[in-house]
Each structure stands twice: as structure tokens, then as C-alpha cells.
């Protein structure tokens, strides 16, 4: 919307300046005219050649957008509506509005305009009507008001004459002041609407930021820490061996340990005491060849088995 408003402003300002600069007004005519009750009055205005084929009309009101049409040229160069007629002279680039049998109610603000796209070109004419007892012109005469622009052709009066001491004021006019005010008001409304829309969008973004403060904080931290850091890494490669070395085989010795099934008891048996005494006296023991050493083995009887030697 902001871009749309910025795009609309320059052409509008240029259009307004075009109507305010002297010499750029497309229509010229009298700013005020005076007529007499019961008589006829002609109002002539002149237009530029580029509006030669456009429709011309005469309306009552001070605002062109709300002006009430009285008479308008259609397919022909002349049209009539009651006591008011309009005639378009395309050769001289003028059109004349004739008001017949004037009354006091005819006094007011009128507009002479050219129908164009968008905003019509127009100028405002103040019509004054005076009672018939005030001599303005000789009876039965018709007065015609003409335009004498500096940059266009000049046309003199064709019927009657303007009495001495009575002067008509001709002022070039563009868009009337109410039209300009309405255009400015429209642009102001457009600007206010654009500002409100931008404010609403800003409020929505603020509400979303308040709902997710952690996310906003993380985004801020990420933006603060967005500086790039670089580290140089050096990789050392090991030289390849020609042949892979097979893993060394460790010799393993296995041994089986078995518990004895029976407990062994050993007993020393001494056969005579004399030998013990001789040993005590220091005599070396002697052993007869006939004597043999006997060994005995004592086993613990098993449970449930009877002794074989009672």
C-alpha cells in the first residue's frame, strides 16, 4: 500500500500543477455574467483543438462531480433542453450556451465543461439576473458574451452590443476550488488508509514477537554470532606397508586339574624301640637284609560299605 500511495502522488501533483500554471488551462470563459429578466443571454467559451470531438455540456453547481446537467451535446453539434440550448462551433473551437427568457431563479453558479475520461475539464460561471425595470439594454435585443483569449482566435459580438459603463470580466479557469478540495481530500484519505494498514501490520509483527520471546532472542544471538570462524587442520598420513603383518599367535597351554576322589592319609610306623635307643646313642642304624620295609595304607571306609577285614 505504501508503494501504491507513492506511485499515485506524483501524477496527481503534476495534474494539479498543470491546472494552476497559467497558459495550461484547457478551457477559457467568463467568470461572471449578468442578464435581465425576460431576456436571453449567451455564454461563449473556447476550448483547445484536442477537445474538438469531445462532448460539451452546461450544468448547474459548483462541483463538477456533483454538477446537474442541463444540456449536453450528443451526436450533433447543437442540442436543446427547454429554455437552454448549446451549440458547438468546431471550426472556431468554441461552444455557446443560450439561456432564453431569464428569471430570477436562474441566478446561481454554473459550469461550462468538456467531457473527458477521469475528471472533466470545466470552469465556473457566476450568473446574475437583474429585474427588468433596470435598463441594461434596449428592449428586444439579445446580448452575447464572448471570449477574447490571447492564445486563441478572437470572436466579436454578433448580436446586440454591450451598453456603456457595463463590463464583463473574463478569467481563465481550470478546475474549481471544490473540485481541487475533493481531490485533495481523496488523496488524504488514501494516505491515512495506507498509514493505518502499515500500523496494523507493525502491530501484528510485534504480537508475534511477544509470543515467542525465546525464538526472537535466539535469532538475535544467531545474528550476533554470525561471524565466520576458520580453523586450519593438518592431517598426518601413515606410510603404507608393503605387506600386511599377520597378528602374532600366542601359544596357549592348557592343563586339567582333577580333585582326588579319596583323601590320602600317611602314617609312619616304628617297629622296635631298641633301634630308637641306638639312634639316640649315636650308633648308625643297621638293617638286616632279611628285614623288609612294609608300607600300609589306611583308607577311610566309605559310607554304606562294610569293612572287608573285620
From Swiss-Prot:
What are the recorded Gene Ontology BP terms? establishment of localization in cell; intracellular signal transduction; mast cell degranulation; negative regulation of B cell proliferation; negative regulation of B cell receptor signaling pathway; negative regulation of eosinophil activation; negative regulation of eosinophil migration; negative regulation of fibroblast proliferation
Q: Where is the composition biased (Basic and acidic residues)?
A: 291-310
- Ig-like V-type domain residues are 27-128
Principal localization? membrane
Membrane topology field: Single-pass type I membrane protein
Gene Ontology molecular function: any one = phosphatase binding
Give one Pfam hit by family name.
SIT
Q: Report the sequence similarity comment from the record.
A: Belongs to the CD300 family.
Quote the function comment for this protein.
Inhibitory receptor which may contribute to the down-regulation of cytolytic activity in natural killer (NK) cells, and to the down-regulation of mast cell degranulation. Negatively regulates the Toll-like receptor (TLR) signaling mediated by MYD88 but not TRIF through activation of PTPN6.
> What quaternary structure, including any partners, is listed in this protein's UniProt entry?
Upon tyrosine-phosphorylation, interacts with PTN6/SHP-1 and PTPN11/SHP-2 and INPP5D.
Protein name per the record: CMRF35-like molecule 8
Q: Which gene name does the record give?
A: Cd300a
Amino acid at each position: 500500500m505504501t508503494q501504491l500511495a507513492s506511485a499515485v502522488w506524483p501524477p496527481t501533483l503534476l495534474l494539479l500543477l498543470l491546472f494552476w500554471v497559467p497558459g495550461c488551462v484547457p478551457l477559457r470563459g467568463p467568470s461572471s455574467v449578468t442578464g435581465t429578466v425576460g431576456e436571453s443571454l449567451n455564454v461563449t467559451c473556447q476550448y483547445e483543438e484536442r477537445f474538438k470531438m469531445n462532448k460539451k455540456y452546461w450544468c448547474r453547481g459548483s462541483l463538477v462531480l456533483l454538477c446537474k446537467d442541463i444540456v449536453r451535446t450528443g451526436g450533433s453539434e447543437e442540442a436543446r433542453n427547454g429554455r437552454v440550448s448549446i451549440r458547438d462551433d468546431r471550426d472556431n473551437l468554441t461552444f455557446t450556451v443560450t439561456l432564453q427568457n431569464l428569471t430570477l431563479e436562474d441566478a446561481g453558479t454554473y459550469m461550462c465543461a468538456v467531457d473527458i475520461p477521469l475528471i472533466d475539464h470545466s470552469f465556473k460561471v457566476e450568473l446574475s439576473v437583474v429585474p427588468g425595470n433596470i435598463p441594461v439594454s434596449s428592449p428586444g435585443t439579445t446580448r452575447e458574451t464572448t471570449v477574447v483569449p490571447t492564445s486563441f482566435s478572437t470572436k466579436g459580438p454578433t448580436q446586440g452590443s454591450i451598453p456603456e459603463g457595463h463590463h464583463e470580466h473574463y478569467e481563465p479557469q481550470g478546475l474549481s476550488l471544490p473540485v481541487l478540495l475533493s481531490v485533495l481530500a481523496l488523496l488524504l484519505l488514501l494516505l491515512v488508509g495506507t498509514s493505518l494498514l502499515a500500523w496494523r501490520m507493525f502491530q501484528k509483527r510485534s504480537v508475534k514477537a511477544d509470543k515467542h520471546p525465546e525464538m526472537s532472542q535466539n535469532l538475535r544471538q544467531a545474528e550476533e554470532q554470525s561471524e565466520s570462524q576458520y580453523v586450519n587442520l593438518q592431517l598426518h598420513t601413515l606410510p603404507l606397508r608393503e605387506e600386511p603383518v599377520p597378528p602374532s599367535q600366542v601359544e596357549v597351554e592348557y592343563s586339567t586339574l582333577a580333585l582326588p576322589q579319596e583323601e590320602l592319609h600317611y602314617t609312619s610306623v616304628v617297629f622296635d624301640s631298641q633301634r630308637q635307643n641306638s639312634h639316640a646313642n649315636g650308633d648308625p642304624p643297621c638293617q638286616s637284609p632279611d628285614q623288609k620295609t612294609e608300607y600300609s595304607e589306611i583308607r577311610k571306609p566309605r559310607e554304606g560299605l562294610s569293612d572287608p577285614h573285620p
